[in-house]
């Protein structure tokens, strides 16, 4: 057998030389893996273990602070009904605000996740500070002007002015949604990359995600106990929306600025190097799909990378010892940056071409949308439980109470699922993307897949929705805790387990981008189910008005007909989602058939 022809030097390559020969393919793979002296310099200059541990702990504290404050949008139900009462918004208009915020919270996630993976979580935290300050500042100003005008009977100075004011309020909640997305993503990505490669990856992700759920609880309690209206006779009124918005704007701006400096990825070069080694051990780097898909001229690579072996050699990657006019440190930084981009873009393309990801993402969409709609409309749902023509003993239950119940159950279940999956779920030998079977697993007396946990809590979520839809809670507001507790537990577990499963199957190097793509889907679900609920609710309002029961309260609906059909449909949506996730796991060419440990 003839010996292989050695790869030509750059000065020997003519226009007719093929850009991707077998030798250059293996050369590319080995060069991307090692980057020769550049990689050695990175390893020699790496942070000491003690300093790295301190940096990780500081970043974790900063991520925890960001997560504890970022979930302000989850308490929308505390003031949604006030918009109806003071600003005379219809249920459709109130849901328009919550849907705009939900849409803005989820839709930019792929772009912001891509930015987080490429430039780091710090700049993303600063982006969140700017959006939160602008959003809550604008919302406070619009609310103050409209509420004062309505109190004086000016009707917001005319219909056109009212439309402009509503458009400004929509813009404010879009800003708040983008700020929420940015702060949450920067915090979770920091924890995923700093701690997500160890055996406690579930807890490392569950803690900031749980803290995000907890943020709604403490903010709702602070609002109801501190930021309330005080009347001249000393009695306590409803939430003081204007001052509460000002407080949230200032708080979140400060927290976002602190995260700009506190959120860091420690030893990221090692993370990328290990990812490349894992890809090569799996044989993925030697496959034509990976290299040719990225480097051939007729099939450009995913994203901004479109490099041939000649381009890579010219850039100093295939031959890092090649002299260059730039300093060694600049060459080293360039090589590290190109290698990082190469790996991240490759993993993004692999993620997008995995059919099980789309089943999983669609299932997440059908689970989270109903949960979001329930949480956003807590305030108006609770009001339907207390028809004004009936006398009730004691104080009616409040939206703040059930926002706190959702927050507490969500937080506890997120921590519980993170801990239990670390203890009971099987662990792959690979710490990065699982491309083929992980081989022999560590023997355990008992193991339970993370997907089993996900399906169990999804069913729990659907039971909470069905309980409300059944009418069992109508005229019995004291029972509402059953629905809010079950929905909070299911919603929290699904939101915690989904990113954990993503890190286990597709690795942590490209986590922000991968999670961002999946997290985009609930925006459509929350918007859709919010509109369904609004349509059912508004139908009840119009029916009551036609029967002569509207009067001064003509924007409100009372009775199970205001919500029952909407929440039955939401429960069915969650059941369909369970089927999709089960198919991705156990179906044809699913994770189980491919030997992927999850």
From Swiss-Prot:
InterPro entries: MFS (IPR011701), MFS_trans_sf (IPR036259). It is a multi-pass membrane protein. Residues 1-49, 315-334 are annotated as: Disordered. Its main location: membrane. Glycans are attached at residues 57, 325. The chain crosses the membrane at residues 63-83, 96-116, 122-142, 164-184, 202-222, 241-261, 355-375, 405-425, 453-473, 486-506, 516-536, 565-585. The keyword ATP-binding does not apply. It holds the Pfam family MFS_1. Residues 22-37 have a biased composition (Low complexity). Gene3D superfamilies: MFS general substrate transporter like domains. Probable transporter. This is Probable transporter mch1. The lineage of its organism: Eukaryota, Fungi, Dikarya, Ascomycota, Pezizomycotina.
